[in-house]
Amino acid sequence: MAVDITLLFRASVKTVKTRNKALGVAVGGGADGSRDELFRRSPRPKGDFSSRAREVISHIGKLRDFLLEHRKEYINAYSHTMSEYGRMTDTERDQIDQDAQIFMRTCKDAIQQLRTEAHKEIHSQQVKEHRTAVLDFVEDYLKRVCKLYSEQRAIRVKRVVDKKRLSKLEPEPHTKRKEPASEKSSHNASQDSEEKPAAEDLPEKPLAESQPELGTWGDGKGEDELSPEEIQMFEQENQRLIGEMNSLFDEVRQIEGKVVEISRLQEIFTEKVLQQETEIDSIHQLVVGATENIKEGNEDIREAIKNNAGFRVWILFFLVMCSFSLLFLDWYDS
């Protein structure tokens, strides 16, 4: 009859644990430790495809983080007026454009190389589908980063155009007129400073002698009044300036529309290029399959030709034997 010794076994395990704990031995060798050892899985050897795919994803993520980190400095075209984000020059922005385009092209070539190698290697259908899904995900991630870069570049170009438009609309003649006025005021101030000691030396100078000078300043109000010819001339000038500003605004609107259209076409072009790469890969696979089928067909044709040749030989041998048999029978009868 079987005896239940479960309680005895548990007491023994507890005694062993207590003894090991008292002696300072790690408890990993007990029941829990053995269970952990049983359920502990050895790490899977990572393949070259997985490591390279993760490397490409890491590079694309670094490019995305870089673009988002320097977004405000990159798209800001008024670096000379704003001190908060005005830390990047146009040369640095152009360098970022060049490096980003090279980086995206390199990532695209790496994805293409991975796709080619994945199709060349012999694996099960499940592994092929998994790798195709991974490459599609990486390619979609690269498309999103390219779209982010295209949007930032379109915003930058738009702001550069706005900046040029504002620089054209600045009142340059007004600044030129201020210089003679300042020179005139400084010249008048120097004349006043030179005439002041003379006035102190001659306090009894009659008022009538200084009246002509005051008259020239008092007549300034009359000089401000414009004649009808001058008013008409200024109105014509205003109409001409308004027409120029309207034409400039129309040109700016056209340029903005063209910039937006260019960015949209660039995005479509990028998507079409990636789509064409996928189609080229599929066509390549079809061509490879067709080549293999043609090879198999040629081998079948060779075998059929060999079989037909053997069949003809047997027929010829049969006819020859029949002919000799008839000749022998004819000779025998005669």
Swiss-Prot record:
Every t-SNARE coiled-coil homology domain range: 242-304
UniProt topological domain (Vesicular) ranges: 330-334
Regions crossing the membrane: 309-329
Broad class of where this protein is predominantly found: endoplasmic reticulum
Coiled coil residues, start to end: none
Keywords assigned: Coiled coil, Endoplasmic reticulum, ER-Golgi transport, Golgi apparatus, Membrane, Protein transport, Transmembrane, Transmembrane helix, Transport
GO biological process, one term: endoplasmic reticulum membrane organization
CDD domains: SNARE_syntaxin18
GO cellular component: endoplasmic reticulum; endoplasmic reticulum membrane; Golgi membrane; SNARE complex
Name of one Pfam family that matches: Syntaxin-18_N
Protein name (Swiss-Prot/TrEMBL): Syntaxin-18
Species of the source: Rattus norvegicus (Rat)
